[in-house]
Regions:
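Alpha/beta-hydrolase fold nucleophile elbow
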Residues: 2-11
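Acidic catalytic loop of the alpha/beta-hydrolase fold
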Residues: 117-122
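Active-site nucleophile elbow and catalytic-triad environment of alpha/beta-hydrolase enzymes
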Residues: 85-103
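Short beta-strand/loop motif that positions the catalytic acidic residue
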Residues: 107-108, 113-115
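Hydrolase active-site cap/lid region
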Residues: 22-91, 114
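Catalytic histidine neighborhood in serine/cysteine hydrolases
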Residues: 131-153
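Short alpha-helix in the alpha/beta-hydrolase fold that links the catalytic acid
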Residues: 109, 123-133
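Catalytic active-site module of serine/aspartate enzymes centered on a nucleophile-bearing elbow/loop
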Residues: 154-183
Length: 183
């Protein structure tokens, strides 16, 4: 039997882990940077009218960007793989056709939501909405907002992962009441 099972979603993982905690009562804690309950709406708001361009053009531009930036290339391939498609544009189309809105009303476990002030407007909106709803269900549900001064205000705190991880593990220590002398 699992006594202390936590799940941590980063970036798009904030959507995939939301789906997991919505349905799996074995999960005792959810951490997300940032939580996403409606990925299609996020894509609509963040990518906007650029999604109306023809698939071949979007894929050509993304291929060029990937050739110039290896990290971007890996991220685009990762998203295509996560959605079971061959390219990023197909992944986006798949999201619009099949992605479900997470029923966050069903989430019962304590949550730690992490958000940088540098996040996109829709990511900040969804984080605040889900936090406001879930904090009343569980006193241990927290929202950590990183301002620019913290050096952790970028998407998923990539500019200060150490600080973000300190917040995560301090919260888990408190939540699970771990005895530090056992380690």
């Amino acid at each position: 039997k699992l006594n202390y099972l936590a799940i941590y979603g980063v970036s798009g993982g904030g959507y995939f882990t939301a789906q997991a905690v919505e349905k799996d009562p074995r999960i005792h804690a959810w951490i997300a940077s940032t939580p996403i309950y409606d990925v299609a709406e996020l894509f609509r708001k963040e990518f906007g009218s650029s999604l109306k361009a023809p698939s071949w053009l979007i894929n050509a531009i993304l291929k060029l960007a990937g050739n110039l930036n290896e990290s971007a290339n890996l991220n685009l391939k990762k998203y295509a793989w996560q959605f079971g498609t061959s390219d990023f544009k197909s992944a986006i189309d798949d999201v619009f056709n099949h992605a479900k809105i997470v029923d966050y009303q069903k989430i019962q476990c304590p949550c730690l939501f992490i958000m940088g002030k540098g996040e996109g407007a829709e990511l900040q909106h969804q984080t605040k909405v889900i936090y406001e709803e879930l904090k009343s269900k569980n006193q241990q549900t927290k929202l950590q907002v990183f301002e620019a001064e913290s050096g952790a205000d970028a998407h998923c705190q990539v500019n200060n992962l150490r600080l973000a991880h300190n917040v995560v593990f301090d919260w888990l220590d408190t939540l699970f009441e771990w005895n530090q002398s056992k380690f």
